[in-house]
């Protein structure tokens, strides 16, 4: 399964544990990720785009009056939104990798094989066990009962002529 597909499934499912981990990680790394985006990621992107500073991109709906300062600037600051989306994606990838690691550990724990039942003894082992048991019994000598002797028939001889 590809990382992109797993990431898409991760974002789409509504697991409470995943959400809690995401909130905690997102809150903990907010300052780090903001610094990473603003100071490391966005300057090279700005350089590639001709010195464009995304944080200052905006659509001015109503310009400010610099003389009287009575009218404030009204603008949609989509550059700040772009920075926030990049920050979110970084946090989401980190949380995804963390959850992937936890799931891998859970699967490894669940996949531990149950202890095997002892194998049935082979015929040789059964025979050796019987011999061992017989040798372990105390030796008792008992006389075999004498059988009544049956009369032995004499062979008939033919008279000599």
From Swiss-Prot:
Residues 142-154 have a biased composition (Low complexity). It is a multi-pass membrane protein. One of its GO terms (cellular component) is plasma membrane. Belongs to the MscL family. Homopentamer. Channel that opens in response to stretch forces in the membrane lipid bilayer. May participate in the regulation of osmotic pressure changes within the cell. NCBIfam families: mscL, PRK00567.1-4. This is Large-conductance mechanosensitive channel. It comes from Caulobacter sp. (strain K31).
């Amino acid at each position: 399964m590809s990382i992109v597909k797993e990431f898409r499934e991760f974002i789409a499912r509504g697991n409470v544990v995943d959400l809690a981990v995401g909130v905690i990680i997102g809150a903990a790394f907010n300052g780090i990720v903001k610094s990473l985006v603003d100071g490391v990621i966005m300057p090279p992107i700005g350089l590639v785009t001709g010195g464009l500073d995304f944080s200052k991109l905006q659509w001015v709906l109503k310009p400010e009056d610099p003389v009287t300062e009575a009218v404030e600037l009204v603008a949609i600051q989509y550059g700040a939104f772009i920075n926030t989306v990049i920050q979110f994606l970084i946090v989401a990838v980190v949380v995804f990798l963390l959850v992937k690691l936890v799931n891998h550990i859970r699967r490894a724990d669940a996949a531990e094989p149950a202890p095997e039942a002892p194998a049935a003894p082979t015929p040789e082992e059964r025979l050796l066990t019987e011999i061992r048991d017989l040798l372990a019994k105390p030796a008792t000598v008992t006389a075999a009962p004498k059988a009544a002797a049956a009369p032995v028939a004499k062979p008939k001889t033919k008279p000599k002529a």
